[in-house]
Amino acid sequence: MISIGVYIHTRSEYPLRWASTEGHVEVVIYLVENGADLNVLKLFYVDKYLQVVKYLIENGSNIHVDDEFTLIYASKGGYLELVNLLIKNGADIHVNDDAPLKWASKNGHLEVVKYLVENGADIHAYNELVVYASEGGHLQIVKYLVKKGADIHAEDDEALKWASRSGHLEVVKYLVEKGANFRAENDYALRWACEKGHLEIVKYLVEKGADIHAEDEYALRWASRSGHLEVVKYLVENGADIHACNDYGLRKASRNRHLNVVKYLMENGANIHAKDDYALRLASVNGHFKLVKFLVENGANIHAKNNEALIRPLGEGHIKIVTYLE
């Protein structure tokens, strides 16, 4: 096509950029040999195409121009060969406070993590390094970083909290066995596990001594608010107080349409009239007809707080509820 006059420099070397990003090394070579300008390329456009990057480096592409992107993207994507090539050609392993190591840890690329650390990456550049790996459930990376001296207690034991929140039981167990403080921030790890419905983690932490009553029954309140019935049952069966904060659990379960949780709490003595029948008022204004019907059938006062259960849903357009309550 070039031999018949096709212009290859159109739109800022678009043909070259497209061939590079698609990994077509033969096309890249052909275009460059016919005058295409390498200087328009950014290596991070082609971060996973090793042969293209090799060719670009060998032909004068400046990898330092794009340090902020290229090595970071290669590490983030787990492209070990590319990471190796970039570092051997002078890319800065410490770019952006060791961001390549951060992203490799966060995305679960163990071999890249090992390579970066063995080549001088600083595991202490980010206090949250173990946190990132724990949040992602990357147990082998967590173990490797801890073995290399990373602090599992960084940011007030944030690693354990995020592993609990994200549902990674094996990571939670490992961190606790290594001395992570599951009582940090008034049992925040337990609360997060309850909020997200990770029953096995909840059980494990409670068995290890986490306090289900911390912060005025926050664990039960969060589990109820989020609708995790099995977690709610477990907590109540282990002594959690369903009346904490004026039956907060019942109120928030009503607000968020968790009928099964509402039923369970009431079967276990929750006060339907707490805070001037707040459960009914919340269910009503938020348009939860089945919940409203259930609460009324079980004695909720539709006239509480100056008929709020009747008036507020009207303003929200919940005509079915208004008609039912009238």
UniProtKB/Swiss-Prot annotation:
Keyword Protease attributed: no
Domain of life: Viruses
InterPro entries associated with the record: Ankyrin_rpt, Ankyrin_rpt-contain_sf
Keywords annotated in UniProt: ANK repeat, Repeat
Placement of ANK repeats on the sequence: 11-40, 42-65, 66-95, 96-125, 127-154, 155-184, 185-214, 216-244, 246-274, 275-304
Name of the featured protein: Putative ankyrin repeat protein L25
